[in-house]
């Protein structure tokens, strides 16, 4: 069994959120699970955040989605494949 996970780190969430969401929406059929993590609550939201995606489908498309996200200033990605 093999699982592919895309880690997305945003350093300026308020500036990057809309652009990141557009990419994720465009590639939505590849996303099986999405988890967003950031520090803060209510009016004290943090400027950085982590999104963890479990991906399905073609690896070339995974790489392309990661590349498009990496083009956004303040966003860094890491594509991880785990197998057992």
Residue ranges, per PLM feature:
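Long, contiguous binding/interaction regions
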Residues: 1-84
């Amino acid at each position: 069994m093999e699982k592919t996970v895309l880690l997305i780190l945003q350093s300026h969430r308020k500036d990057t959120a809309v652009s990141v969401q557009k990419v994720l929406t465009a590639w939505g059929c590849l996303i099986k699970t999405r988890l967003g993590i950031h520090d803060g609550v209510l009016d004290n939201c943090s400027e950085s955040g982590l999104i963890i995606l479990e991906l399905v489908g073609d690896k070339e498309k995974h790489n392309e989605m990661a590349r498009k996200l990496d083009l956004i200033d303040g966003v860094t990605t890491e594509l991880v494949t785990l197998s057992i």
